[in-house]
Amino acid sequence: EAVKMGYYVITCDYLPNNPGHQYAHEYYNVSTTDKEAVYELAKRLQVDGVVAYASDPAAPTAAYVCEKLGLPTSPYTSVEILSQKDLFRRYLAEHNFNVPKYVGCSSYPEALEQIKNLTLPVMIKPVDSSGSKGINKLTNVDQLKDFIEDALSYSREKRIIIEEFIEKDGYQISGDAFSVDGILKFHCFGNEYYSSSVVKDFAPLGECWPFQMKPEIITELEKDIQRLISELKMGTTAYNVEAILGKNGKLYILELGARSG
């Protein structure tokens, strides 16, 4: 679409066979998680903007590069908070958003001690992976060592979170949103479907629209997203939204990734 709109498009990542590259004017084999390499590439090519799409780990890189080059962006520190699950959970808790009880750790011995503060079942997640990789639902402490090792194997920062499982009321909420100059201007929320038997790598099976839930839930979600956008001083940005209405009646924002797709 960017090409159709007349933009000169340059793509980069470490997988040359990814399908999007064939539509770009130029492709460079540079990992989107290597901030300095992407910065040097963008500076050399004198780009006018950097956009992260479909993958949370690329979002901080885009913000970092734009900030260093003086290009339009939301603050790098804010994007980093949105992109790392432990930082995001801490931010939510400190700013009075609903958040499941959680602990952060970086090793099995630490997790074994910390999990005593939680009620099973719990979710174990890498703080910085994408595509639901390394996510497991733990129902028995005997599973802990394997699940910790799995989560750590997908974390570049070698950090994980363990959080109490939220019993959903209805479907999980998923979709995209856009802010313009810090104001939420658009969203499309859908019902997200998961296999009832899934216990690992919680990738959705699909989504459907229109969203089937009470209008007041949408209103509450809009208010929470706008508050996050305002407090984090986000600018003109796309977001990937994941939320859950718990059976306890509380609405939880699980993800507000600073990227679309």
What do the predicted segments below correspond to?
Residues 1-78, 109:
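ATP-binding N-terminal substructure of ATP-dependent carboxylate-amine bond-forming enzymes
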Residues 37, 110-114, 143:
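Short acidic active-site motifs
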Residues 50-53, 102-105, 165:
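Structural motif
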Residues 67-134:
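A conserved helix-loop-beta module that forms one wall/lid of the active-site cleft
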Residues 98-100, 121-124, 136-169, 200-207, ...:
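Conserved ATP-binding module of the ATP-grasp superfamily
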Residues 167-172, 176-234, 238, 245, ...:
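ATP-dependent carboxylate/phosphate-activation module, predominantly the ATP-grasp catalytic core
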